[in-house]
Amino acid sequence: MTDSFAHCASHINYRHKMKTMFIFSTPCCSPSTAFFSPFRASNSKPLRSTLSLRSSISSSSITSTSHCSLAFNIVKHKEKNVVSANMTSSVSSRTFLNAQNEQDVLSGIKKEVEAGTLPASIAAGMEEVYLNYKSAVIKSGDPKANEIVLSNMTALLDRIFLDVKEPFVFEAHHKAKREPFDYYMFGQNYIRPLVDFETSYVGNMPLFIQMEEQLKQGHNIILMSNHQSEADPAIIALLLEMRLPHIAENLIYVAGDRVITVPLCKPFSIGRNLICVYSKKHMLDNPELVDMKRKANTRSRKEMAMLLRSGSQIIWIAPSGGRDRPVANSGEWAPAPFDSSSVDNMRRLVDHSGPPGHIYPLAILCHDIMPPPLKVEKEIGEKRIISYHGTGISTAPEISFSNTTAACENPEKAKDAYTKALYDSVTEQYDVLKSAIHGKKGLQASTPVVSLSQPWK
């Protein structure tokens, strides 16, 4: 987050841009060549090994040779059918993209540290993520696990290294960068091999379909959700992309400052639509920055208000202000309590935006894939654990403020009652997902309130 913010109006684009990349083997030390083919929804399980990537360069000509401007700024260009090796090299350092095996990757990290181009602390994190990602993908049992790891990790390390050299600065409203490098597909393809789709579920899929219809009518959708891990946006998109690619690609996430400042997180954040804010949990970490953070949050709220006035927006927000943690006395994971002020501020923005608005409770269970530290930490640089596991999301019917608070005596009680209704719904749905995934009940965990399905089948 910085003090410079520019308004960037967003409009819904119903031309789906889902693209699948296929990597073809190349001779040793020669640049990998990437080709796109259109993504087609099917009734089969989401592809895993075929969706790994070495590079996500879009099929367009590029008008500059500067790697920093190519990586971080949208430039005018004309369509072309093929991406040349020179275009690929113009937006990357090649140190990691040229790696042919694990030894090349690890020696590349060491080489950049010795050259003084990569801080030792970031290098240690890169190596840790590589080894943990490798372990998780191998445990998935995919016969092409080693190829997937090399392809996806070299792409990630390349993007991290580029950002170290030319740090990307997020605006208050950040639009996912799809060109010349497709950061959205990069994130999808990186997280996909970590998801056990056989033990993953979506609750109340018809309601998600209803949301898409409301978006087409110009309505706004707000998802009041719990927050489990840095992988939440990718998990939501992966579980919806086969049936609802528009929602998967156009969801806007209210994001805390850590995911847009931590080098290991930034490449994934660049590929998502974001409203950038400072979390209440870290607002007072540095007293000297409190005033700046509050002013920045005010700017972000104004950006959000402008978006909502344009209509057809779907926004995800975690009113808890941070990720869920295990309950102290039991060690069980549960949604963190919602902050009533955050809920009320969001509701007021929707109510005063003009277009009709709908607020839905959303539950997500995915902490096993990238669990956060057991307690909130002030310092940046947490240990990054990665696992292969089933995941789930669920929504419930929208909750009306007026109906929920009709009997409340004053605004404060109304605010608390509405927050409780949303939180209770999220908790109820979360328990169903937990029963299906951790309790291994699968689709049989469905209840009259939550109907589980696997829409990718």
From Swiss-Prot:
GO biological process, one term: CDP-diacylglycerol biosynthetic process
Disulphide bond pairs: none
GO cellular component: chloroplast stroma
Top enzyme category: transferase
Organelle transit peptide residues: 1-88
UniProt EC number: 2.3.1.15
Catalytic function, reaction form: sn-glycerol 3-phosphate + an acyl-CoA = a 1-acyl-sn-glycero-3-phosphate + CoA
Function (record text): Esterifies acyl-group from acyl-ACP to the sn-1 position of glycerol-3-phosphate. The enzyme from chilling-resistant plants discriminates against non-fluid palmitic acid and selects oleic acid whereas the enzyme from sensitive plants accepts both fatty acids. This is an oleate-selective acyltransferase.
Name of the protein in its database record: Glycerol-3-phosphate acyltransferase, chloroplastic
Native species: Pisum sativum (Garden pea)
Lineage of producing organism: Eukaryota, Viridiplantae, Streptophyta, Embryophyta, Tracheophyta
